[in-house]
């Protein structure tokens, strides 16, 4: 038994022993793991400590520039020397231990800088040390160079920068943080350029762009800092520059300022007299267009429009610029103004969109305009759904905008005769926009509309006269395009969108909306906006340039006639565009895009708009729809 039992006992003992060993080994491994982790953490700490230890000296080790700017350069030098000496000792020591490897590092260290080696030796990992050193070294030089640049522009910055560095004291971190501050400062600087002047100077962006915080007054200068900043800073200047096309970058905001100036002159705006309508249009950005659309005779009246000559001229210029250049380039207000007369020609494009008298009612427009009293003047013959949002108010001669919803071609005859028509010119007054959406090419002159549209009107309509079509497209683009985009890049986007949209026949409605813009019709901005007239649209495009002026964009409304979209569609589109342009124009504040939060139109939205049965009798209803659907 003993012999037999012995092996068993031994085997058991062995098993127990093995088990214990395994357990111990596992425990040992765990401990080792913990140790290694701790060591790694310690190394990390050391590295960070090293970086932070010499933020002053570490930062400037590699950079001579930092030393130049540094007040405590002497201390820096001392630190340098110390590392030097220690580095010599360390090097010898390291060489003993590490031999060849250390030699290589030593060589490198000599080439680069002794400071590294001491650090690396202390850390027991040259590579690790060199890494932190490298970061420190790299960041300080960049930082210093930056500081130097800033210091050149602003002496006090160097003083400020050291302070910042001290506060941040963190090697590379310090530099980065400084930069961050600088970046942030510019924005603040624009907001309170005077107060933050010092800070802005500190900021490196601030220096170059922000160094002129005061010049922020000039919207153009503000552009550099940032779109948002520019808007904030430029807003005030923008008000002054409402007439100018350049400041329009912040057009979205400018329009509101402009409308205010225009309103006083546009009080007749409600009157819708040609001048009044011009004023209102200008105010809405439609006026300019309206004038542009009006026959040549109307264009002169347009100028007289109550709207300040500036606003009119801006509109006119804008119209012209838009009409003439297919690109919808916003011509300088002056050019547009000059074009105003030419606009009659240019208007032909718009005219194409709006049959002047004939536009009154292209036969296709079956529905008599609802009773927009002023608007309906001409329109009665062709039944049209007056889109007059607030028809009642001269402000909203949407009635003038009336377009037969059923008409696929959005025939909108805005009786230029409205108050405008008298001023406009006989015969021409019924410049109702008759947009034969379907026949984008042939613009319906409408029975009533003699060539008054403009000789080119039919052709221009078909051709979407270069100026008009791009403009219109741009208008459409703005409609479909983000209203917000329009605000910021309205003009450019509008152009691009307009081109794209032009390609889409679905844009007809936009055309119709533009056609809705009746030069004669005193499409007040609100009307245009409510109608979503492309004119208002065009205004959006140009709002930047003429947003305040009244958009003069109406010419932009120039049809992109894809005559298929029914008036209702164009109505929706117009309203959408109007909403967008509303953002730009205070006149239509009632439907500001921002408030409506209107998104760019989608194909579904277009179809919805295209629905001929979708007739919104009431302007308010229309607006609601617009808000709900869009």
UniProtKB/Swiss-Prot annotation:
Residue runs in coiled coils: none
GO CC annotation terms, alphabetical: cytoplasm; dendrite; glutamatergic synapse; neuronal cell body; nucleus; postsynaptic density
Tissues of expression: Highly expressed in developing cortical neurons, peaking during dendrite development.
Residue positions, PTM Phosphoserine: 64, 113, 151
Cellular localization per UniProt: Cytoplasm; Nucleus
Residues the record marks as site: Required for ubiquitination and degradation: 571
Protein name: CREB-regulated transcription coactivator 1
Gene: Crtc1
């Amino acid at each position: 038994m003993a012999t037999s039992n012995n092996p068993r006992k031994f085997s058991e003992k062995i098993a127990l022993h093995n088990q214990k060993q395994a357990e111990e080994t596992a425990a040992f491994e765990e401990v080792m793991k913990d140790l290694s982790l701790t060591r790694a953490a310690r190394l990390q700490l050391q590295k960070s400590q090293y970086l932070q230890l010499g933020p002053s000296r570490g930062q400037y080790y590699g950079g001579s520039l930092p030393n130049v700017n540094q007040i405590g350069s002497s201390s820096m030098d001392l630190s340098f020397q110390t590392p030097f000496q220690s580095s010599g000792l360390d090097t010898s020591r390291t060489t003993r231990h590490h031999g060849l490897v250390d030699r290589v590092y030593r060589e490198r260290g000599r080439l680069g800088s002794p400071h590294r080696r001491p650090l690396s030796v202390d850390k027991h990992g040259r590579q690790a040390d060199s890494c932190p050193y490298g970061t420190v070294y790299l960041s300080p030089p960049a930082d210093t160079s930056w500081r130097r640049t800033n210091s050149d522009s602003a002496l006090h910055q160097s003083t400020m920068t050291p302070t910042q560095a001290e506060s941040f004291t963190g090697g590379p971190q310090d530099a980065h943080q400084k930069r961050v501050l600088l970046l942030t400062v510019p924005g603040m600087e624009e907001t309170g350029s005077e107060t933050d002047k010092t800070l802005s100077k500190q900021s490196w962006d601030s220096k170059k762009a922000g160094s002129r915080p005061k010049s922020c007054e000039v919207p153009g200068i503000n552009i550099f800092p940032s779109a948002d900043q520019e808007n904030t800073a430029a807003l005030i200047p923008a008000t002054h520059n409402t007439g100018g096309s350049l400041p329009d970058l912040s057009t979205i905001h400018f329009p509101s300022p402009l409308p205010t100036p225009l309103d006083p002159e546009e009080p007749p705006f409600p009157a819708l007299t040609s001048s009044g309508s011009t004023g209102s249009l200008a105010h809405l950005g439609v006026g300019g267009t309206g004038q542009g659309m009006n026959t040549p005779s109307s264009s002169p009246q347009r100028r007289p429009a109550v709207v300040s000559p500036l606003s009119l001229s801006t509109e006119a210029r804008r119209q012209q610029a838009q009409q003439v250049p297919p690109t919808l380039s916003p011509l300088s207000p002056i050019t547009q103004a000059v074009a105003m007369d030419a606009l009659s020609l240019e208007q032909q494009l718009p005219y194409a969109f709006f049959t002047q008298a004939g536009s009154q009612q292209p036969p296709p427009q079956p529905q008599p305009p609802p009773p927009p009293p002023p608007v309906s003047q001409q329109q009665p013959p062709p039944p049209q759904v007056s889109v007059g949002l607030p028809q009642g108010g001269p402000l909203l001669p949407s009635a003038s905008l009336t377009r037969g919803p059923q008409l696929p071609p959005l025939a909108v005859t805005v009786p230029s005769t409205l108050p405008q028509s008298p001023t406009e010119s006989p015969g021409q007054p019924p410049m109702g926009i008759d947009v034969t959406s379907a026949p984008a090419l042939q613009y319906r002159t409408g029975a009533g509309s003699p060539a008054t549209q403009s000789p080119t009107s039919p052709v221009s309509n078909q051709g979407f006269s270069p100026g008009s079509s791009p403009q219109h497209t741009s208008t459409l683009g703005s409609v479909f395009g983000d209203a917000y985009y329009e605000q910021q890049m309205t003009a450019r986007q509008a152009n691009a969108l307009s081109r794209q949209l032009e390609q889409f026949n679905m844009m007809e409605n936009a055309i119709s909306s533009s056609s809705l813009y009746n030069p004669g019709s005193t499409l007040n901005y609100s009307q245009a906006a409510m109608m979503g007239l492309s004119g208002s649209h065009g205004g959006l495009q140009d709002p930047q340039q003429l947003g305040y002026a009244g958009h003069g964009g109406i010419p932009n409304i120039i049809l992109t006639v894809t005559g298929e979209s029914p008036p209702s569609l164009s109505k929706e589109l117009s309203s959408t565009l109007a909403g967008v342009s509303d953002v730009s124009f205070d006149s239509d504040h009632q439907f500001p895009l921002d408030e409506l939060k209107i998104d760019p139109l989608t194909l579904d939205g277009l179809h919805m708009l295209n629905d001929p049965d979708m007739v919104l009798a009431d302007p308010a209803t229309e607006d609601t729809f617009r808000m709900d659907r869009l």
